Swiss-Prot record:
Residues reported in the UniProt entry to bind S-adenosyl-L-methionine: R296, G318, N347
Reaction(s) the record says it catalyses: uridine in 28S rRNA + S-adenosyl-L-methionine = N(3)-methyluridine in 28S rRNA + S-adenosyl-L-homocysteine + H(+)
Protein name: 28S rRNA (uridine-N(3))-methyltransferase
Enzyme class, UniProt record, top EC level: transferase
One Gene Ontology CC term in the entry: nucleolus
Annotated EC: 2.1.1.-
Annotated localization: Nucleus
Alphabetized Pfam families for the sequence: Methyltrn_RNA_3
Annotated CDD domains: HsC9orf114-like
Keyword Nucleus in annotation: yes
Organism: Drosophila melanogaster
BP term (GO), one: rRNA modification
Taxonomy of the source species: Eukaryota, Metazoa, Ecdysozoa, Arthropoda, Hexapoda
Gene transcribed to yield this protein: ptch
């Protein structure tokens, strides 16, 4: 009797054989599974983003609680018309360079360039902000003010960033002749200061990050995604041996000065009139102490020391016609006396020898005379940064002491190793005297043979003194002048 074989219930690989599915159904199931996984991933990323945001908020609150107050600031206002008094374009640029140097020497935080001529009395063509790319304001400004502001910004910018922010322009034609500011934030490549100025690069980075050029060999990966071309201040993180990339954190431009006390340059602002100096202040509370300079003001030597207690101080300088002319050309100001606009109206050089003092000269004189009168509410912290921010050594002006000592020791070693040189320590008669070179004949003395050779012949001319000539005078007609033909 034949036996019937049972149908197989499993495949050769051990998997149960189920009902047959079409490829359409299989693809639908795969798409649904893929969609579910993608949705779970998005939910997980959203949850992580919320957690990171909450942690960042807590960290920001903690940092804000620990942050130090910003130090007190010093601002100066200079008229743009001072460039019109220069006789050439080179002198215009040089005057702007003098103002920039004075601002950096006395640690000025803001430079305001204002128009003291006014729109009604301006004779040359105005250029709008939109046409020059300086902003979106509809106001106008004189070309001299624009040139002064542009040169001031150019000199303040670190050298490795100028090509990103300053294209070729006729106002900067002679900027290469100007003296460099050499401020602390103009760092060299070998400087190891933890703060650096940089620009965001157009370079692909991971999400939430971007690359910044801070003047090093390689770009720095910063912690925020910002559009390219923006100037930023980067706090450098200590580089670990395991990480190849240099990382940094974007911070406020005020943080380097607040944390280390180092001077971090100045900001430049343009004011269309004298009134805009006060009304468009970048500080929320405005300027609490204002000082005007004029030869009609109070003697600066009569002002007590440390009497100007300020948080945001402003010093205004006049042009060729003084502050009185700037006040008369401003239509928004109704006062006639400029002394009413300022808290203090001083004469920084009472006994001047010249009838006029140029604005770039008055700037140095005033800032030097007012140094003992200022009392900032929040002073800069004092930290020794000599090793991190070398002054003249970093710019190549002077040589460090260790370099001088090493060169001196090297030279001394070379002298000691010279075999021909003898050094006498003490006078001693027992030691043999050094050999003396034999005396040679005087090379300048004429021998008898040379004198015989030098005896003039009959056809030669001889120059003799007037004492050897006889008293009889000879006329030119009696002499034979044929030899001159």
């Amino acid at each position: 009797m034949k036996t019937m074989l049972a149908a197989p219930t499993a495949s050769s690989n051990g998997r149960p054989i189920g009902p047959h599915k079409s490829w359409k159904k299989v693809n639908e199931e795969r798409k649904a599974l893929k969609r579910q996984r993608k949705q779970d991933k998005l939910l997980k990323e959203l949850q992580q983003a919320k957690e990171a945001e909450s942690q960042a908020g807590k960290a920001a609150n903690e940092v804000q609680a620990k942050d130090k107050p910003n130090p007190s600031t010093l601002s100066i206002a200079v008229p743009g018309s001072i460039l019109e008094n220069a006789q050439s374009n080179e002198l215009r640029a040089y005057v702007a360079g003098q103002i920039a140097r004075a601002a950096c020497i006395f640690r000025v935080n803001e430079v305001i360039v204002f128009d003291d001529v006014g729109i009604a009395t301006a004779r040359e063509t105005k250029r709008s902000y939109e046409a020059d790319g300086e902003g979106s304001s509809t106001g106008t400004v004189r070309s001299s003010s624009l040139q002064l502001a542009r040169i001031l910004q150019y000199l303040e910018c670190p050298q490795y960033l100028r090509k990103y922010f300053f294209p070729l322009h006729k106002d900067l034609k002679y900027s290469g002749l100007l003296n460099p500011l050499d401020t602390p934030h103009h760092l060299r490549q070998q400087s190891k200061f933890r703060y650096r100025e940089g620009v965001i690069c157009d370079k692909k980075a991971k999400e939430g990050h971007s690359y910044a050029n801070v003047g090093l060999l390689n770009d720095v990966l910063v912690d925020k995604a910002i559009e390219p071309g923006v100037r930023v201040t980067v706090k450098m993180e200590p580089q670990s041996e395991s990480c190849r990339k240099q990382r940094g954190t974007l911070v406020s431009p005020d943080e380097p000065r607040r944390e280390t006390g180092v001077y971090w340059g100045y900001q430049v602002r343009i004011a269309h009139s004298m009134s805009e100096i006060f009304t468009k202040s970048p500080y929320a509370t405005g300027y609490d102490v204002t000082v005007g300079t004029s030869d009609r003001g109070t003697n600066v030597h009569e002002v007590p020391n440390r009497s100007y207690n300020f948080n945001h101080m402003l010093i205004v300088f006049g042009g060729l016609q003084g502050l009185e002319s700037a006040l008369a050309n401003d239509e928004k100001l109704t006062v006639d006396d400029p002394e009413l606009l300022f808290d203090h109206y001083v004469n920084v050089l009472p006994r001047q020898g010249s009838r006029t003092i140029r604005t770039e000269e008055a700037l140095l004189i005033a800032l030097a005379a007012l140094q003992e009168k200022l009392q900032p509410q929040v002073a800069d912290v004092e930290i020794d940064l000599t090793d991190l921010l070398p002054k003249s050594e970093d710019s190549g002006i002077a040589v460090r002491r260790d370099v001088l000592v090493s060169k001196k020791q090297k030279k001394r070693k070379q002298v000691e190793d010279t075999p021909d040189e003898t050094v006498v320590d003490e006078p001693s008669f027992s030691k043999p005297l050094p050999k003396v070179a034999r005396l040679t004949a005087n090379p300048f003395a004429d021998s008898s043979e040379e004198l015989a050779k030098n005896t003039p012949a009959q056809d030669d001319f001889e120059v003799v003194s007037s004492t050897t000539v006889s008293g009889t005078s000879h006329s030119c007609a009696d002499d034979d002048l044929s030899r001159f033909d």
